[in-house]
Amino acid sequence: MPYVDRQNRICGFLDIEENENSGKFLRRYFILDTREDSFVWYMDNPQNLPSGSSRVGAIKLTYISKVSDATKLRPKAEFCFVMNAGMRKYFLQANDQQDLVEWVNVLNKAIKITVPKQSDSQPNSDNLSRHGECGKKQVSYRTDIVGGVPIITPTQKEEVNECGESIDRNNLKRSQSHLPYFTPKPPQDSAVIKAGYCVKQGAVMKNWKRRYFQLDENTIGYFKSELEKEPLRVIPLKEVHKVQECKQSDIMMRDNLFEIVTTSRTFYVQADSPEEMHSWIKAVSGAIVAQRGPGRSASSEHPPGPSESKHAFRPTNAATATSHSTASRSNSLVSTFTMEKRGFYESLAKVKPGNFKVQTVSPREPASKVTEQALLRPQSKNGPQEKDCDLVDLDDASLPVSDV
């Protein structure tokens, strides 16, 4: 289906019989440009072709006299129509019936507009900028589509009117941002590191347009063409985080694709070849490193400060204090255990045989707890005694003897 691109040209794919009467139709990409008064075709979309690829064929619209349906002339070719251009007939084949009708209509409309008509007393819409009344300003408008938004800018035509009088000098004043395409670019303050054409994806419409990129020491910008003075956009290198080969190139169906990642947006740019892609990545990365310096990218290591050393010694001091307290507590427990042991044996010496009672351990209490309770339990000076116990005979041989 024919569609209108950003330059207001009608584009689309058709099959054309390039060799007359051969009956062989080849797939080509057609562009109908009424401003250039031409109908040209390429092997593929020029955006997908390498830079400098030439067109396959072209016809001036002024040479086309009529465009009509040719299904009866070529019954074997479906949806066929014919263009009568001079001494030759060009047969083309559309995709379907609706595609055929639309191409025939737009071509007939184009040749009606572009063919000059001397008998017309009133200028048509296409020639309003060329013909005007004597003594009046001739104002034309230029439409640019930037980021999917149409921008209409009034411009002045540098020409002489039909009455032979030169246009007023006020008409020759131009805005500095809207100079003609043939104006050469002035010398830049920063040296240009790399420049060339690449294909870029739009931010809003997500379509791909061929732009002229230019990299200098501080920025990377892209222009509509190499003859433009003002760039469509300038990206400061300080906002660029990284430049790398795009990992989504297979998803986007684009070869030689790399991405420029910034703070607000990721720019997808397609180069003409893998070598050109790597050259752009290397050039932009080198410019970023040269601007920021290698010191910023390297991570600096700081030695530990006095506060860190102070904290580092705290665990050692705490461990030392803990060990001292544990040792003192162990010595205290050993002393207590020794004293209690002596008291225990002294009490046994005063107890009658058969009256000695052993402490029972509860199944719910651990042995360590019972031992600690036994050690810490205060005892009388003479040891535990019962009320009904008799006097102990110290000469009894059955009494236990302790070596104290």
From Swiss-Prot:
CDD domains xrefs: PH1_TAPP1_2, PH2_TAPP1_2
Q: What is the effect of changing residue 211 to L?
A: Abolishes phosphatidylinositide binding
The protein's matches in PANTHER family, at most eight in alphabetical order, are given as:
PLECKSTRIN HOMOLOGY DOMAIN-CONTAINING FAMILY A MEMBER 1, TANDEM PH DOMAIN CONTAINING PROTEIN
Q: Which gene encodes it?
A: PLEKHA1
What does this protein do, in the record's words? Binds specifically to phosphatidylinositol 3,4-diphosphate (PtdIns3,4P2), but not to other phosphoinositides. May recruit other proteins to the plasma membrane.
Q: Which organism is it from?
A: Homo sapiens
Tissue specificity note: Highly expressed in skeletal muscle, thymus, pancreas, placenta and lung. Detected at low levels in brain, heart, peripheral blood leukocytes, testis, ovary, spinal cord, thyroid, kidney, liver, small intestine and colon.
Residue ranges constituting the PH domain according to the UniProt record: 7-112, 191-289
Mode of membrane association: Peripheral membrane protein
What subunit structure does UniProt give? Answer: Interacts with MPDZ and PTPN13.
Q: Name one GO cellular component term.
A: extracellular exosome
* Sequence segments annotated as region (Disordered): 291-332, 355-404
Name its cellular compartments: Cytoplasm; Cell membrane; Nucleus
Q: What is this protein called?
A: Pleckstrin homology domain-containing family A member 1
About its domains, the entry says:
Binds to membranes enriched in PtdIns3,4P2 via the C-terminal PH domain.
Q: Its Gene Ontology molecular function terms?
A: PDZ domain binding; phosphatidylinositol-3,4-bisphosphate binding; phospholipid binding
Superkingdom, taxonomy of origin: Eukaryota
